[in-house]
Amino acid sequence: MIISTTHSIEGRQITAYLDIVSAESVQGVNVIRDMFAGMRDFFGGRSQTLERALKEARVQATDEIKERARALQADAVVGVDFEISMPAGKGGMVVVFATGTAVKLR
């Protein structure tokens, strides 16, 4: 399964646009362990806890759009876009939303 942020696959022709596929992944962030993330960011550090949560959420969302595209018998998902949200007041959650178009290729 080819996953691409571009709207075409070099060397391949899109023969059918099947459907929009999307997925979301919500990851909890350990607020107590990472309550100093804001200070680290302020002083130029990096929050490994938050980076891990974001990476895991992105991987899960990508895997889910692959599964949904396979169910449509797609060869690829093009135009993939990721949106990241950290809802305020939700106790340290990271939400990644992925969307793209499932296509058939020649």
From Swiss-Prot:
Domain of life where this protein originates: Bacteria
Pfam families documented for this protein: YbjQ_1 (PF01906)
Coiled-coil zones: none
HAMAP family hit by this protein: UPF0145
Family, as annotated: Belongs to the UPF0145 family.
Protein name per Swiss-Prot or TrEMBL: UPF0145 protein Pfl01_1745
